[in-house]
Amino acid sequence: MNGAECEPLLQTDRYLMRNCARKLIRTADRIKEETGAKEFIIALKAAYTREIESLERAIEELGSSVKLHKLQSFFPAGDEQTIVYEVTGRVVPPAAIPLSVGCVVSNVATIYGIGDAFEGEPFTRKFLTVTGEVAHPTILRVPVGTPVSECIALAGGTHLSRYIVVNGGPMMGKMIPMEEVPNSYVTKTMSGLIVLPEDSAIARRNQVTVKHMINQAKSACIQCSFCSQMCPRALLGHPIRPNKIMRKLSSGTPIGEMLNDPDVRNAALCCECGICEIYACPMGLKPRTVNSMLKKELAKAGIRYQRPEGVEYTARPERGMRKAPTERVASRAGVGAYENLKIDDFFSVNPEEAGCVRLSLRQGIGAPSVPTVKDGDPVKAGERIAACPEKSLGSELHASVSGTVSIDPDGAYIEIRTGKSWSYEKQEP
């Protein structure tokens, strides 16, 4: 179980480990039994002393065989390939998944959700950290599809007249401009909401266009190779070298003609953690964003990474000296002022008191779900409203509140109208 929660500012998993340790340990034991796994290990940072105490107490009280593995405080400790190496010493090969080396990694909230599933409860509510420029940084549990604006209101609102919201963490999250907040809704994969000033460092970074990025690379890249030296995947022995990609980009060759270059194709191995552009690059360039753009171009061209056969991958010997401390990463990301906030407040929205929700039919990287209900159908919270497409990877979708269905004509979402305005009733998790 990945309890590192390495993104600065996010504290949802830490809250669950402190307050729901017994449920997590019971679920872990059952998962181990059901799957026949040899071990169940919870990896979390050694600095999480309160969380460690709660988990150790639950393990002792339940007589569990679950083990704890204490990590250093660095970013991205929670990257699944990084955490596999930290715990087991095994290197996941490039473009492979942890299962290829006999491991499965799930985060804390996922294990909590599996515990709900064991009890017959579908996934309809999401835990979130709401922090930054809000009156009361808070851990929320809200129905999937809750308006982002309501989540901010639950945290006491913001004093800012102009702001952005980061969906996720400051390193890997996506920016929601203020104008788009009223039309943004909680999804299954949303981990946190960070409210920041409109002129914050994160907002400025997100305003750089692809053309500007390329021009910056041409004029300012000094080929120091710090991006490659600090890259977590390169340090695991993977052949990605961001500085070489930036060098090719600065040559002026059209992107379409670069896609056959082996160095450019290695952009597919980027985990998009952001260490290269936010922490390593002394010139403020954007190797991660370039890699993300190239990955999309490679996908459009139908080019997939081909791992050479017979190659054994080993972590680089200098890896231990090149881990980026979490607090310094937060400072470089421009959110250092919020990093040490202790968030113990919790607020759970009662689904029976919730207002209208909007559930996207594309909740993850799989195929969009297919509605199993029609316009005007009444539904109860927990009822299935969309199914995974046949012969495709995806997920089912369940009503997070009770109400009447309204399906988007373009097939993007299902809205459930409860006939109520938003009302907040505090509950225990």
Task: Label each region the model flagged.
Residues 344-367, 388, 396-399:
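Short beta-strand-turn/beta-hairpin segments enriched in glycine/proline and small hydrophobics
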Residues 380-394, 412-415:
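Short hydrophobic beta/alpha edge segments that flank linear recognition/processing sites
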Residues 90-94, 98-99, 107, 308-350, ...:
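Extended boundary segments
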